[in-house]
Amino acid sequence: MKTRIGVFFGGRSTEHEISVLSALQAINAFNKDKYEITPIYITKQGKWFSGKALLDVSNYKNMEALQKVCEEVYMIPEYGDYNLYKKHKPMFGSAVLTTLDVVIPVLHGSNGEDGIFEGVLETIGIPYAGCNTLASANGMDKITMKMVMQSSGIPIVDYVWFTDKQWYTQREKLIAEIEEKIGYPVIVKPANLGSSVGISHADNREELIAKVEVAEQYSTRIVIEDMVEDLKEINCSVLGDCDDYRPSVCEEPIKSGDILTYEDKYMGGSKSAKGMQASQKRIPADLCPEDTERIQFLAGETFRVLSCHGVARIDFIIDRKTGKIYVNEINTIPGSLSFYLWEASGIPFDKLMDTLMNLALKRKRESGMKTVSYDQNIFNLGKGIKGGKTGIK
C-alpha cells in the first residue's frame, strides 16, 4: 500500500510564489511507486484547494480559473483525524477527499515556516516532515534566532533590534546605539521574513531612517546588523534530526550587488522564476578545506541548538579581510528544499524525499512514547478538590 502524502504549499506569505515552485519540484521528485501524492494549495487569502490542475505551474497565471477546477478542502483540528474533507459536501458520496498518512509543509515565510502551520499539524497529531513549532518559530524570527545562537557560542555579526513603536518613541536613542555599537554601513532587515524580502543597506543616518521605514512595512520588529563590506556568502544544508544529522557540500551564491536579492535567488538571471535551484551559484564553493570543515561544523551546530528536523539551509558570511566566518541565518524550509546541494552530496532528490518521510514517521513514533496526559481523572478524587458542591474556588 502506498504512503499517502499531503504536500501543503502557497500560503499567506510574501514568498507565496516561491513556495509553489518548491512544492512542485518536491512533488515531481517523489517516487510514485511508493507514494500517493495529494497537493494542497493555500491561497493568499488562506483558502485550501486540491486537484490535479495544481501540478501545472502555468495554471497559476489565472487563479480564478484554477480554483474553479479544484476542490476546496479543509482538515479538522481534532487529534487523530487525518482526513482531508471537501468543503462543499456532495449530496451523494463521501465528504472525505482522502486520508493522509504524512504531511510535508513546503511553505516559505510567514504563516507557514514560522511555526503557525506546524502547530496545526501538532494539534491534529499527524506525522509531518520538517521542524516542529518551536524550531520553526525560532528559525523564522531573526531576533530570537540570534539570541539562541549567540548564547550557544555560534559566531554572528553585531546587531541591534527594536520594535516599530520604539523607533517612533526612541528614535534618537536607537540611532545613537546603532552608531556606537555597529557604525555604518549597516544591513536593515524585517525580523520575520526570508528570501531577502524587505532587506536593504544604509551608509548613513539619513539612509538608515529611510530603510527602516521600508522594513516596517513587513514587520513590527526590525534588526540592524553590522554590514561586512568585503564578503563571501556561503550556504550549507543539513539533513536529519538533533540526534543524527549531516551537512551537505557548500555553495557560493552569485549576487548582482551588495546584497543577495530576491531576484538573485529565484530569477537566476532569467525572466521567469524557477525556484532556488535557478539562482547562479558555485557548487562546491571555492573554499579551502579548513573553511569548508568549519562551515559544515557550524551548520550542524546551528541545526542542533535550534532543535531542527528534516532539511534546513544555513547561510554564512565570510569576511574576506579578516577571514572570520559568521552564521547569517537559517532557513527551516529552504527554497527547492536545497535538493541541488544534496544531489551534489550524493543524495538524489527522490532519496531526499524518502529520508524526510522516514524522519517524520520516526519522530511520530518517538513522540508517542512520551507522557502527554494522565489516565486518572482528578475530578473523581472527591476530597482532592476544594469547593465541594459549590464548585472550584
Please report, for each region that a protein language model flagged, where it lies by residue.
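Active-site nucleotide/adenylate-binding loops and adjacent lid/helix of ATP-dependent enzymes
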Residues: 3-9, 13-14, 20-28, 93-97, ...
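ATP-binding N-terminal substructure of ATP-dependent carboxylate-amine bond-forming enzymes
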Residues: 1-134, 138-140, 144, 163-173
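Hydrophobic beta-strand scaffold residues
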Residues: 37, 127-128, 156, 186, ...
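Phosphate-binding site of ATP-dependent enzymes
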Residues: 203-275, 286-291, 297, 325
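Short acidic-glycine loop/turn motifs at beta-strand connectors
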Residues: 43-46, 240-243, 319-322
